[in-house]
A protein has these predicted regions:
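A short, Lys/Arg-rich alpha-helix, primarily the initiator
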Residues: 1-17
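Short, charged recognition helix plus adjacent turn
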Residues: 9, 15, 34, 52, ...
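DNA major-groove recognition helix of helix-turn-helix
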Residues: 11, 36, 46
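Short alpha-helical "recognition helix" segments of helix-turn-helix
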Residues: 21-22, 50
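Recognition helix of helix-turn-helix/homeodomain-like DNA-binding domains
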Residues: 27-41
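Short, basic-rich loop-to-helix N-cap that marks the start of a DNA-contacting helix
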Residues: 39-52
Length: 72
């Protein structure tokens, strides 16, 4: 699942509106909506703003990248 959709799911689970996030971050609602629906990539700066508005760490919606083990 992409980061935007994870954020959208988090918002829905916690009763937080996209308008609230847009107002707290300064990201236009239309732009935010496109990102949360997977139709636009989030910039890292926007991602940081969203995490700050939600009071969560920037690792909240990211999947850990597991390095490939060579020779195993």
């Amino acid at each position: 699942m992409c980061v935007g959709k994870k954020i959208k799911s988090y918002l829905e689970s916690n009763g937080i509106t996209q308008t609230f996030v847009a107002n707290r971050t300064g990201i236009p609602v239309q732009k935010l909506n496109l990102s949360l629906n997977g139709n636009r990539r989030l910039d890292f700066d926007e991602y940081e703003l969203i995490c700050g508005a939600l009071s969560v760490g920037t690792d909240k919606f990211l999947e850990p990248k597991i390095p490939e083990q060579k020779g195993v």
